[in-house]
Each structure stands twice: as C-alpha cells, then as structure tokens.
C-alpha cells in the first residue's frame, strides 16, 4: 500500500500548537480594509483555532505534519 501523503495546501494553512490543537488564519485579510473598522482589522490579525467539528477532517489531511 502506498504511503499516505500530507495535503500540501492544508499544510500551508494550518499549524500545530503545543497542546495538539490546530491554529488557523482568518479570512478577509488581503484587501478592502477601508470598509472595515479598526476593531475588525485588529481582530483579523489574530489567529483562530480550528473548531471541533472540523478538527478530525483536517487532521486526516495533515498526516505528516509535526
């Protein structure tokens, strides 16, 4: 049976945390900031965590990620 490979697009978008969770980055951060408030822009800078409902599916794509 061939080796299971890491989904490379997912590996670039998620990082493993020290406690075993998955850190994700927020959407809506590339352009069109003039329509957003300072508070919205500040919150978009922070990374978020992957929700429990998505965790199992994303973890399967990231088999080789340490």
UniProtKB/Swiss-Prot annotation:
Keyword terms of this UniProt record: Ribonucleoprotein, Ribosomal protein
Positions of the UniProt region annotated as Disordered: 1-21
Biased composition (Basic residues): 1-16
InterPro entries: Ribosomal_bL35, Ribosomal_bL35-like, Ribosomal_bL35_CS, Ribosomal_bL35_sf
HAMAP family linked to this entry: Ribosomal_bL35
Family under the similarity heading: Belongs to the bacterial ribosomal protein bL35 family.
Protein name per its UniProtKB record: Large ribosomal subunit protein bL35
Organism the protein comes from: Streptococcus sanguinis (strain SK36)
């Amino acid at each position: 049976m061939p080796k299971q490979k890491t989904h490379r697009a997912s590996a670039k978008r998620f990082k493993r945390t020290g406690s075993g969770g998955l850190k994700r980055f927020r959407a809506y951060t590339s352009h069109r900031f003039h329509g957003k408030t300072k508070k919205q822009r500040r919150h978009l800078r922070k990374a978020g965590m992957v929700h429990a409902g998505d965790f199992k599916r994303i973890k399967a794509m990231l088999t080789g990620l340490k």
